[in-house]
Amino acid sequence: MSERVLLHVGTPKTGTSYLQDVLFRNRPELAEAGVLYPADRFDAHFLAALDLMRLPWGGLETQAEGAWGELARRVREHHGTAIISHEILASASRQQAARALESLGHGDGAEVHVVLSVRDLVRQVPAEWQENVKRSGEHTSELQSH
């Protein structure tokens, strides 16, 4: 069982994609240091998060089926430190978080550390708006002055 699990939950638009890219590209080097980043494909943690949270996502939920269980199994079988990272985990419900902790071996002695990356609100709001516009094509909003 992993001794320590670093569970990076985002939040969105805080450099998470860059961090995940660095972790994914450096899996062999991390493994040499005893650190597991369990991913055979770049979006493995995204699919696992969709599965854990049972989120619909444009048909990807069928690809996601069983992904969290597989990721958690690999973490439990690893002896050392494991890292899991995806920003949609920041919106997990209390029940989803409890299920994640249990499946990662928290009740059996694994140390699970939740890592939260944040951004100052002045930059976060426009970044979220821009991301929503990119995904949906258009977005209108009325802002009231105070």
Describe every region a protein language model picked out.
Residues 1-82, 86-88:
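PAPS-dependent sulfotransferase catalytic core
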